[in-house]
Design a protein with these regions (language model features):
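Terminal connector regions
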Residues: 103-151, 157, 162, 214-232
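N-terminal secretory signal peptides that target proteins for export/translocation
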Residues: 1-9
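Intrinsically disordered, low-complexity segments enriched in serine, threonine, and glycine
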Residues: 162-232
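N-terminal signal peptide c-region/cleavage motif recognized by signal peptidases
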Residues: 24-26
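Beta-sheet-dominated interaction scaffolds and their linkers
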Residues: 30-53, 153-163
Length: 232
């Protein structure tokens, strides 16, 4: 029996193929270019901090572009990242320098959130320039916490200070500390709740099924990207 492909089926197959190629390329690119940390802590008394970038692929060259965004996802000039653009050969490591240009304009009683963005653009081989080749740039995005000196408590003490308030199907997380608290593996009884990040001296609300009962348990992510002990 002969099967006639409709425009819909062709379009569908093309979409599936494109998504498959994107997933494969993303996996390769993410494995090739890696950052040396999952988050950056910027102490206020330092003029700069360093972030290593490594190209683990011996055969590929990448153009690396970097920039800083604020908590509102807008490019921000309060921190300068250098070099902002450079070429990276295979099996090489480079170091990004993040320089404080805030001129003491940020709050001194709590952390401030920024984002470090590093885009890896694969170089095109000469024999590919006349071909219809799909080139995908991958952006690695990690948090940067600007941390003032002489805060009222140590960051390790912050998770235990987190408080909870429930109203029906809304659970509010209240953070009285000067630190951002990244909450993960949160449960009410045996029910999983969404991961979230609570700003310093602020609060965040998440949905909780109305019928769910039980004590709240959670973990947080520390300065090194590791999980802290379970808190109940």
């Amino acid at each position: 029996m002969q099967t006639t492909r409709t425009p819909y089926s062709v379009s569908f197959m093309a979409t599936v193929l494109l998504l498959f190629l994107f997933a494969c390329h993303s996996t390769i690119a993410n494995a090739a270019v890696a950052l040396g940390a999952t988050r950056v802590i910027y102490p206020a008394n330092q003029k700069q901090v360093l972030l290593p970038v490594t190209n683990n692929d011996p055969a590929s060259v990448y153009l690396i572009q970097s920039w800083i965004e604020n908590a509102g996802d807008q490019k921000d000039t309060q921190f300068v990242i250098t070099p902002p653009l450079f070429s990276m050969q295979g099996k090489k490591e480079n170091t990004l320098r993040i320089i404080n240009a805030t001129n003491h304009q940020l709050p001194s009683d709590r952390e401030s959130l920024f984002w470090v963005n590093v885009k890896a653009i694969p170089a095109m081989e000469k024999d590919q320039k006349n071909e219809n080749t799909l080139q995908l740039a991958i952006i690695s995005r990690i948090k940067m916490f600007y941390r003032p000196t002489h805060l009222a408590m140590a960051p390790e003490e912050a998770p235990a200070m987190l408080r909870f308030r429930r109203s029906g199907s809304i659970l509010t997380l209240i953070n009285p500390t000067p630190y951002f608290i990244t909450v993960t593996n949160m449960k009410a009884g045996n029910s999983n709740l969404p991961n979230t990040m609570v700003p310093p001296k602020g609060e965040v609300s998440v949905d909780i099924p109305h019928a769910v009962t039980g004590d709240i348990s959670f973990q947080t992510i520390n300065d090194y990207g590791a999980l802290t002990p379970l808190i109940r």
